[in-house]
Swiss-Prot record:
GO cellular component: plasma membrane
Recorded topology in the membrane: Multi-pass membrane protein
Coiled-coil ranges from the UniProt annotation: none
Domain of life: Bacteria
Main location: membrane
UniProt name for this protein: Inner membrane-spanning protein YciB
Statement: the UniProt record of this protein carries the keyword Cell membrane: yes
Family per record: Belongs to the YciB family.
InterPro entries xrefs: YciB
Functional description taken from the UniProt entry: Plays a role in cell envelope biogenesis, maintenance of cell envelope integrity and membrane homeostasis.
UniProt entry keywords in alphabetical sequence: Cell inner membrane, Cell membrane, Membrane, Transmembrane, Transmembrane helix
Localization annotation: Cell inner membrane
Gene: yciB
Spans through the membrane: 36-56, 64-84, 90-110, 135-155, 162-182
Length: 197
């Protein structure tokens, strides 16, 4: 359910983007609704509403949610200010690479890698497995960032579809692969440091 809530702004962005632009008037102001700029405005507004509601309910947001919200406001704001979708195309790569940087930094900062801090309360695994899993997440975020960047600037008519459904598909595939990998190690002795091949 929480993952679906995070997906709402992106889904609304996609729906508005796919609409044929049509003139509208609100409070005496006329504008065109539909297309990339209306979709960007919808992304910003819906992100503020969704994460604002989550913050009021939980009194906090996860660091990843803060990063996503700030990136949406910055890159979405630049897109609308300069009327250039180039800024928005950089949002997904930058966010993914910042996530990769955060996961990588946890190998050197603190006593636990980031994936263990996130999932350690639910799973008991040897540290070597946690380390390998953390490296897999780093590789995943680096790949997603590169894939988003490549599609955004190579396939102009397809990048929004990929941003929504391609990224979602890659995440699902990665999570399934992670589940299969973890199933092999759930009964490992946490005191051991040598992972299975």
């Amino acid at each position: 359910m929480k993952q679906f809530i995070d997906f709402i702004p992106l889904l609304l962005f996609f729906i508005v983007y796919k609409l044929d632009p049509r003139p509208m008037e609100v409070a005496g102001h006329s504008f065109e609704f539909g297309g990339i700029y209306s979709a960007t405005a919808m992304l910003i507004i819906s992100s503020l509403v969704v994460y604002g509601a989550l913050f009021l309910r939980q009194r906090k947001l996860k660091k990843g949610q803060w990063l996503t919200l700030i990136a949406c406001l910055v890159f979405g704001g630049l897109t609308l200010t300069f009327h250039s979708e180039t800024f928005l195309k950089w949002k997904a790569p930058v966010v993914n690479w910042l996530f990769a940087l955060g996961f990588a930094g946890s190998h050197f900062i603190g006593d636990r890698v980031l994936i263990k801090r996130i999932m350690g309360h639910a799973l008991t695994l040897p540290d070597a497995i946690w380390s390998r899993l953390n490296l897999a997440w780093i590789a995943f975020f680096l790949f997603c960032g590169a894939a988003n960047l490549f599609v955004a600037f190579t396939f102009q008519d397809f990048w929004v579809d990929f941003k929504v459904f391609g990224s979602l598909g890659m995440t699902v595939i990665f999570l399934v692969a992670q589940g299969v990998y973890l199933s092999r190690h759930l009964h490992d002795d946490p005191s051991t440091s040598k992972p299975k091949d």
